[in-house]
Amino acid sequence: DQVRKCLSDTDCTNGEKCVQKNKICSTIVEIQRCEKEHFTIPCKSNNDCQVWAHEKICNKLPWGL
């Protein structure tokens, strides 16, 4: 999958959200899958989950985002 960079949710398609911490579009399903397969963490908000999932699991990008 192509990583989609974003500044806000409007830059993302298909109902994806923009994760502010690393500016990458992500689906809720992808986030839930990450959590389910790896860890379960308490989330204060959905955005917490997105940031966590991206940084720890889904997008370990070679250029150090």
From Swiss-Prot:
Pfam families: ACI44. It comes from the Eukaryota. InterPro entries: ACI44 (IPR032767), CPA_Inhibitor_I44 (IPR053758). One of its GO terms (cellular component) is extracellular region. Its main location: secreted. Keywords: Metalloenzyme inhibitor, Metalloprotease inhibitor, Protease inhibitor, Secreted. It is found in: Secreted. GO terms for molecular function: metalloendopeptidase inhibitor activity. Inhibits carboxypeptidase A. Belongs to the protease inhibitor I44 family. This is Carboxypeptidase A inhibitor. It comes from Ascaris suum (Pig roundworm).
